[in-house]
């Protein structure tokens, strides 16, 4: 692939790691953020200490606070901003674009209020005149491992398979590999909802439960994620792939996962506001729990784990009681899809 110019919007842990992957592949990478001190640090010291204490970035990676400069004459734009500001940043990009680009996103969540997936937001805010079909980059991927060039396999999903193949070539190298998919609904739904199950898995650990319980919540969590995804129009096979069970395993079993750590702290009795303050990072699983619960209620989809976590976070229920209540739910077949 010829050298591409790429703007990466969001210099958080994942945005920074993906910027390095793209830089390793010989592309011109521009990181954009709105924290002046962080941008200056990246440009001057070639570090991003808030997220990576011992990592030095390539000096060719340039960082910007001016969005217009960051996206000027680029071939593609990668959104890696928190869900809650995706629409705002997309509006800003739409007002500045002067030519057609490939639009990608690598965030995982659902918009509060509208319940929309992130690709839908980007489609609504950025005119087709200036973009390809949206490409979703998602899968089992800790930034802490990708940044040290550990082997990572994820998915590039788009309704336009050629756009997905472009992104596949853009990122893939000897340690980072992408597989294509056209099931955008499934890939985005899996990526968002696995954060809820990771909170639950972390809570089980914090409460002192063992591997049996953790395996159960991950497996039954996958079942309810799939149930909702299918109701939304997803291909059930997607949930057995990298962006489904793969992402759920890596997020639901690892201390690298901020959602798992948040659940662990909840299980140990910490208050949510203290957890969010101490972590200093967005915990997408918290807001996604509310959105997923509301969607499930609207569509009458059975999601007991999501409901239990929702009641603990938003209704003040005891997390242990909520989990134990699930053990007395009505008996069901393992393969029920409603």
Swiss-Prot record:
GO terms for molecular function: glycerol-3-phosphate dehydrogenase [NAD(P)+] activity; NAD binding. The active site is at residue 194. The keyword Acyltransferase does not apply. It is found in: Cytoplasm. It catalyses: sn-glycerol 3-phosphate + NAD(+) = dihydroxyacetone phosphate + NADH + H(+); sn-glycerol 3-phosphate + NADP(+) = dihydroxyacetone phosphate + NADPH + H(+). One of its GO terms (cellular component) is cytosol. It is an enzyme of class 1 (oxidoreductase). Gene3D superfamilies: N-(1-d-carboxylethyl)-l-norvaline Dehydrogenase, domain 2, NAD(P)-binding Rossmann-like Domain. Its main location: cytoplasm. The keyword Repeat does not apply. It comes from the Bacteria. Sn-glycerol 3-phosphate binds at residues 108, 139, 141, 194, 247, 257-259. Keywords: Cytoplasm, Lipid biosynthesis, Lipid metabolism, NAD, NADP, Nucleotide-binding, Oxidoreductase, Phospholipid biosynthesis, Phospholipid metabolism. Pathway: Membrane lipid metabolism; glycerophospholipid metabolism. NADPH binds at residues 13-14, 108, 143, 258, 282, 284. Its EC number is 1.1.1.94. Catalyzes the reduction of the glycolytic intermediate dihydroxyacetone phosphate (DHAP) to sn-glycerol 3-phosphate (G3P), the key precursor for phospholipid synthesis. Belongs to the NAD-dependent glycerol-3-phosphate dehydrogenase family. This is Glycerol-3-phosphate dehydrogenase [NAD(P)+]. The lineage of its organism: Bacteria, Bacillati, Bacillota, Bacilli, Lactobacillales.
């Amino acid at each position: 692939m010829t050298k591409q110019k790429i703007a990466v919007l969001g210099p958080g842990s994942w945005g920074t790691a993906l910027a390095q992957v793209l830089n390793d592949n010989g592309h011109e990478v521009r990181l954009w953020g709105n924290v002046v001190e962080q941008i200056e640090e990246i440009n001057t010291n070639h570090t991003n200490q808030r997220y990576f204490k011992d990592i030095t970035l390539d000096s060719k990676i340039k960082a910007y606070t001016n969005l217009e400069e960051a996206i000027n004459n680029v071939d593609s734009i990668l959104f890696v901003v928190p869900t809650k500001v995706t629409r705002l940043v997309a509006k800003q990009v739409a007002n500045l674009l002067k030519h057609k680009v490939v639009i990608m996103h690598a965030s995982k969540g659902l918009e509060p209020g509208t319940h929309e997936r992130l690709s839908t937001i980007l489609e609504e805010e950025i005119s087709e005149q200036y973009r390809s079909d949206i490409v979703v980059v998602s899968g089992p991927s800790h930034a802490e491992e990708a940044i040290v060039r550990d082997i990572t396999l994820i998915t590039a999903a788009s309704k336009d398979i050629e756009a997905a193949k472009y992104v596949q070539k853009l990122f893939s190298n000897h340690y980072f590999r992408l597989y294509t998919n056209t099931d955008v609904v499934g890939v985005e739904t899996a990526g968002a909802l696995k954060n809820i199950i990771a909170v639950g898995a972390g809570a089980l650990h914090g409460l002192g439960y063992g591997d049996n319980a953790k395996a159960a919540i991950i497996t039954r969590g996958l079942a309810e994620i799939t149930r909702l995804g299918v109701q939304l129009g997803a291909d059930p096979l997607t949930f057995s792939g990298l962006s489904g069970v793969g992402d759920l395993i890596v997020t639901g079993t690892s201390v690298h996962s901020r959602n798992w750590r948040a659940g662990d702290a909840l299980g140990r009795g910490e208050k949510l506001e203290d957890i969010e303050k101490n972590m200093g990072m967005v915990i997408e699983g918290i807001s996604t729990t509310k959105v997923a619960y509301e969607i499930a209620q609207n569509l009458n989809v059975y999601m007991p784990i999501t409901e239990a976590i929702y009641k603990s976070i938003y209704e003040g229920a005891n997390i242990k009681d909520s989990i134990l209540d699930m053990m007395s739910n009505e008996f069901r077949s393992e393969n029920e899809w409603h």
